[in-house]
Curated annotation (Swiss-Prot):
Present with 2970 molecules/cell in log phase SD medium. It is found in: Nucleus. The gene is ORC6. The modification Phosphothreonine is found at T146. One of its GO terms (molecular function) is DNA replication origin binding. This is Origin recognition complex subunit 6. It comes from Saccharomyces cerevisiae (strain ATCC 204508 / S288c) (Baker's yeast).
Length: 435
């Protein structure tokens, strides 16, 4: 809900004169608007209303916020229950329901008017402090030098971690409370030292390209394996070379092993036809239709058919694949009759787009989807428009079904037989004419 709608509901509950143009950017009206908006957004997930009661949700939230404002800050504030667009009895019932649901969702059941504890304003960045105990260059030499140099540096230098100044703690009661919507948060712009330290550490462990530095990886390996200090320098250099090669590949060893195992089993995990419960967008469907050069009207019909059946699909790509191929076979039926290789080209192209090498899966999708849409009006109109019925023209179907006067199995002897045959032919031909 927009802020203007919230302000309109608050004005109706307080019966403010719209001609006076009250100031919503400051004062108690701003606090009431913010409190109403918070209550409204919270109640959307906590309180379910009927369709005729939904129009009063914002008014009820505005009434509850005004009541709280009246109890805590402004005893002379006037608010009216008859401004809620519901019956008074039903409005009171819904207000009790809102209070119960919203109070149960709050972790604090008893409100105590005690001062909130102040945040620590001491930050090592603002006060000129440092996060590390020594210079990074010295740390790098001590950590990644040879074992002999590491031992000497450990014996000669003693690391002293400077203690941070003590935190200023203010005595506060044991009972704390949440800040209400009417209270302004004065410390929103302050930065906490814990978050600053975490962000700086995360940036220091990552390079510009988004991958971790080799030095930090070697440092972790050095700490995890205490026996690595006694290994010769050549072994460490070979290990660092292998780690650099692995980083150059860009994939961890676990993914490489998984991909190798899948290649041995012959599985293709990236096939779109076996992807379950994925939500396809209209842009993806239109892009697939454009790949097969389908007309605009046909693409729109495919999108409509997908939206109708989208809620009960497990593998939605199978439906879209079957719809596109069935329509492609009809639209390009003339070229298919002239060149049989086009069918193979269409199926191969769909296999590459679906990221599968199994032609049987694509053909199975075509058969299943055709059973679904064979009786749809838009599909029948498409067949009539392009004169294609399972790869056969309409006149050929009539010849096979009713025969002609020249066939020996359908010789017409009397005028009545001729009239019946003529009536059937005219009826079948009339089905192809647009309504």
């Amino acid at each position: 809900m927009s802020m203007q709608q919230v302000q309109h509901c608050v004005a109706e509950v307080l019966r403010l004169d719209p001609q006076e143009k009250p100031d919503w950017s400051s004062g108690y009206l701003k606090k009431l608007t913010n409190a109403t908006s918070i209550l409204y957004n919270t109640s959307l997930n906590k309180v379910m209303l009927k369709q005729d009661e939904e129009v009063a949700r914002c008014h009820i939230c505005a009434y509850i916020a005004s009541q709280k404002m009246n109890e805590k800050h402004m005893p002379d504030l006037c608010y009216y229950i008859d401004s809620i667009p519901l019956e008074p009895k039903k409005a009171k019932h819904l207000m009790n329901l809102f209070r119960q649901s919203l109070s149960n969702s709050s972790p604090m059941k008893q409100f105590a008017w005690t001062p909130s504890p102040k945040k620590n304003k001491r930050s090592p960045v603002k006060n000129g402090g440092r996060f590390t105990s020594s210079d990074p260059k010295e740390l790098r030499n001590q950590l990644f030098g040879t074992p002999t140099k590491v031992r000497k540096s450990q014996n000669n230098d003693s690391f002293v971690i400077p203690e941070l100044p003590p935190m200023q703690t203010n005595e506060s009661p044991s009972i704390t409370r949440r800040k209400l919507a009417f209270e302004e948060d004065e410390d929103e712009d302050e930065e906490e030292p814990g978050n600053d330290g975490l962000s700086l550490k995360s940036h220091s462990n990552k390079s510009i390209t988004g991958t971790r530095n080799v030095d930090s990886d070697e440092y972790e390996n050095h700490e995890s394996d205490p026996t690595s200090e006694e290994e010769p320098l050549g072994v460490q250099e070979s290990r660092s070379g292998r780690t650099k090669q692995n980083k150059a590949v860009g994939k961890p060893q676990s993914e490489l092993k998984t991909a190798k195992a899948l290649r041995k089993r012959g599985r293709i995990p990236n096939s779109l036809l076996v992807k379950k419960y994925c939500k396809m967008t209209t842009e993806e469907i239109i892009r697939l239709c454009n790949d097969f050069e389908l007309p605009r009207e046909v693409a729109y019909k495919i999108v409509d058919e997908y939206n109708i059946n989208a809620s009960r699909l497990v593998c939605p790509w199978q439906l879209v694949c079957g719809l596109v191929l069935n329509c492609t076979f009809i639209v390009f039926n003339e070229r298919r009759r002239k060149d049989p290789r086009i069918d193979h080209f269409i199926v191969s192209k769909m296999c590459s787009l679906m990221l599968t090498s199994k032609v049987d899966d694509v053909i199975e999708c075509v058969k299943l989807v055709k059973e679904l849409i064979i009786g749809e009006k838009w599909f029948r109109d498409l067949q009539i428009r392009y004169d294609d019925f399972d790869g056969i023209r309409y006149d050929e179907i009539i010849f096979r079904k009713l025969g002609s006067m020249l066939q020996t199995t359908n010789i017409l002897v009397t005028d009545d037989q001729y009239n019946i045959w003529k009536k059937r032919i005219e009826m079948d031909l009339a089905l192809t004419e647009p309504l």
